[in-house]
Regions:
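N-terminal secretory signal peptides that target proteins for export/translocation
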Residues: 1-5
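Bacterial N-terminal signal peptides
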Residues: 7-20
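Formylglycine-dependent sulfatase
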Residues: 17-199
Length: 199
């Protein structure tokens, strides 16, 4: 009986030592495939007196090393071929400079309405898939045109924010239904709940 208790105690100690070594291992790179990023397991403290313990660094999500800046420019009521950046006659030096250093996307469906275009650009989905068939004031309540972007939609800004980017939106929003735009909320379709730190 005593021999089996000693054997059990030795086994438990060995398992405990192996587990503590596993927890003490340096965390590897973060897996960014699933958001939000999960905090790596913290090492167990081996110090009994909290006054002598070393506090591990706080977990913070940061953008990956060398991550590019992401700037999206959406201008209402301007044709695709108007700016010189896309071969048009209107000189826009700042836009030209941004286009020279970045990527130009020229295959994007627009509805010629601001709310659906913004919703499609932000989500990467067809505007009706995210319930923005018209501008929010003309929402019908029918599928694809409720004027309420589903909470299950992952906006680009939220994806970037969860990967450690600082995000901001400037200018017109026009994606919150009129009946949700009050000081009482709901706020889940406001810019700061769609992934933007600042608006």
């Amino acid at each position: 009986m005593n021999a089996s208790l000693v054997g059990l105690a030795v086994s438990c100690c060995a398992v405990g030592m192996i587990a503590s070594q596993a927890f003490a291992a340096e965390p590897g790179p973060l897996d960014r495939a699933i958001l939000p990023l999960q905090e790596p397991a913290r090492p167990l403290s081996k110090v009994l007196d909290a006054r002598n313990a070393t506090v591990p660094p706080r977990f913070e999500v940061k953008a990956p090393d060398g991550a590019p800046n992401v700037v999206i420019v959406l201008i209402d009521d301007m044709g695709f071929g108007v700016p010189t950046a896309f071969g048009g006659p209107v000189s826009m030096p700042t836009l030209d400079a941004l286009a020279q250093q970045g990527l130009r996307y020229n295959n994007f469906h627009t509805t010629a309405l601001c709310s659906p275009t913004r919703a499609a650009l932000k989500s990467g989905r067809n505007h009706q898939t995210v319930n923005m068939g018209f501008i929010t004031e003309l929402a019908t309540g029918l599928p694809g045109s409720t004027g309420q972007i589903p909470n299950a939609t992952a906006p680009l800004a939220e994806t970037l924010r969860l990967n450690g980017y600082a995000t901001a939106a400037f200018g017109k929003w026009h994606e919150t239904a009129a009946w949700e735009a009050s000081v009482a909320g709901p706020f889940d379709r406001w810019p700061t709940r769609q992934g933007f730190d600042k608006f």
